[in-house]
Amino acid sequence: MWLPRVSSTAVTALLLAQTFLLLFLVSRPGPSSPAGGEARVHVLVLSSWRSGSSFVGQLFNQHPDVFYLMEPAWHVWTTLSQGSAATLHMAVRDLVRSVFLCDMDVFDAYLPWRRNLSDLFQWAVSRALCSPPACSAFPRGAISSEAVCKPLCARQSFTLAREACRSYSHVVLKEVRFFNLQVLYPLLSDPALNLRIVHLVRDPRAVLRSREQTAKALARDNGIVLGTNGTWVEADPGLRVVREVCRSHVRIAEAATLKPPPFLRGRYRLVRFEDLAREPLAEIRALYAFTGLSLTPQLEAWIHNITHGSGPGARREAFKTSSRNALNVSQAWRHALPFAKIRRVQELCAGALQLLGYRPVYSEDEQRNLALDLVLPRGLNGFTWASSTASHPRN
C-alpha cells in the first residue's frame, strides 16, 4: 500500500501550529469574575405568567449585589412567534446562558438595530441598568424606580449592559418560557455557570383569575404555548393554556425531586407565592440564603412597604411591582371567580394542586369561606421543597 511521504519540516510546522493553538485556547480569559475574585452566582427565577414572578424578580433586582433582567427570552418569542414553546426551548436556553455570562452579543439575532438600553424588554425595571456604570439615575445601592429611570437612561448605549453585568457578583434572570427542567440540564452541568434555580409556583385558581385580567397582553404567548403557528389566542374558554402551565409545573417539580441528577443537588428550590405573601421576610431570607445574598435593613424596609399596601392593586399595575396587600392579592380569586370555573380548573390541574399543596374546594360556600385555609403545610406527601436539604421524597 502506497503512503504519501511527509517531510519532517511539515510535521514540525504542524506540531508548532497545534502547540500555539493549544496555548491560545488555554490562555483565553474565561467568564469574568466580579470584584473580589469570587465566582459569580447565576440565579434563574423559573415560573409562569401571573404567578408573582415580577414581584420575586424585584426582590432580587433591588439587592445591591444583583444584576437583573426581566424575561430576556421575550425577544426570542417575539422574533420567532410562529414556533412552539418546545421548538424554541433551545434558543431560549442559549440566550439565557449568554446573558448569564454577560455576553450581550446574543441579542444581535433578535435586536439587529440595538443601540440603546431601552431596546431591551422591560429594561427600566432593572436597578442595575439605572445605576452606574450603566446610568446615573440612582446611586448603585439605592432602590430604583422605573418611572424615574425611563426618561433619564433610555438613550444610554446598549454596550453598557455588558459592563454593568460584569460588575456584579450575582446575575439573576426571571423567565416564564421554560416548560420542563431537562432543557436546563446543560446549564446546570456547565462549568462556566454557578446556577441556582428558584421555581416559583402559585395556586392555579389564582393564576386563572389574574390571567383573565390581562388576556390581551398574553395573546401572542398563548399562541406559542398552544403551538398555533403564529396565531394569537386571547380567548381560551377551554383553559388549555392553564392546563399546560399546570402540567409544566408538575414536570419541573417532579424532575427536581423524584430522582434528580447529581448536578441538581443544592441548586433547586421551590417557592409558593402564597408562602411569600404570608411570611415575606422569612421566605425572602431563605431565598437569599439559598442564593448567597443577605438581607439589608434598607431592603427589609422596602419589602415591608410593598407587601403591606392597601388592596390588591389596580388592573393597570398588573405587570408592575407596586405597594399592595400581598395576602389580599393571594386570596382575591376566592371572591372574583365563579365556582363553576374553579371546579373546571381543579379538574384540569388536579395533579398540580396535589403535588404543590393546594386544597380543592367542593362548594361555593367553601370557596368564599376565608377561614378555610387552602394552602397546605409544606412537605405534604413527602414533597421535597429544596434539593439542598434532601434529594428524594420520603415514602
UniProtKB/Swiss-Prot annotation:
Keywords: Carbohydrate metabolism, Corneal dystrophy, Disease variant, Glycoprotein, Golgi apparatus, Membrane, Signal-anchor, Transferase, Transmembrane, Transmembrane helix. It is a single-pass type II membrane protein. Its main location: Golgi. GO terms for cellular component: Golgi apparatus; Golgi membrane; trans-Golgi network. The chain crosses the membrane at residues 6-26. GO terms for biological process: carbohydrate metabolic process; keratan sulfate proteoglycan biosynthetic process; N-acetylglucosamine metabolic process; sulfur compound metabolic process. Gene3D superfamilies: P-loop containing nucleotide triphosphate hydrolases. 3'-phosphoadenylyl sulfate binds at residues 49-55, 202-210. Changing residue 274 to K: In MCD; abolishes the ability to sulfate keratan. Expressed in cornea. Mainly expressed in brain. Also expressed in spinal cord and trachea. InterPro entries: Carbohydrate_sulfotransferase, Gal/GlcNAc/GalNAc_ST, P-loop_NTPase, Sulfotransferase_dom. GO terms for molecular function: keratan sulfotransferase activity; N-acetylglucosamine 6-O-sulfotransferase activity. Changing residue 203 to E: In MCD; abolishes the ability to sulfate keratan. Residues 1-5 are cytoplasmic. It catalyses: 3'-phosphoadenylyl sulfate + keratan = adenosine 3',5'-bisphosphate + keratan 6'-sulfate. It is found in: Golgi apparatus membrane. Glycans are attached at residues 116, 229, 305, 328. Residues 27-395 are lumenal. Belongs to the sulfotransferase 1 family. Gal/GlcNAc/GalNAc subfamily. Sulfotransferase that utilizes 3'-phospho-5'-adenylyl sulfate (PAPS) as sulfonate donor to catalyze the transfer of sulfate to position 6 of non-reducing N-acetylglucosamine (GlcNAc) residues of keratan. Cooperates with B4GALT4 galactosyltransferase and B3GNT7 N-acetylglucosaminyltransferase to construct and elongate the sulfated disaccharide unit [->3Galbeta1->4(6-sulfoGlcNAcbeta)1->] within keratan sulfate polymer. Involved in biosynthesis of keratan sulfate in cornea, with an impact on proteoglycan fibril organization and corneal transparency. It is linked to Macular dystrophy, corneal: An ocular disease characterized by bilateral, progressive corneal opacification, and reduced corneal sensitivity. Onset occurs in the first decade, usually between ages 5 and 9. Painful attacks with photophobia, foreign body sensations, and recurrent erosions occur in most patients. The disease is due to deposition of an unsulfated keratan sulfate both within the intracellular space (within the keratocytes and endothelial cells) and in the extracellular corneal stroma. This is Carbohydrate sulfotransferase 6. It comes from Homo sapiens. The lineage of its organism: Eukaryota, Metazoa, Chordata, Craniata, Vertebrata.
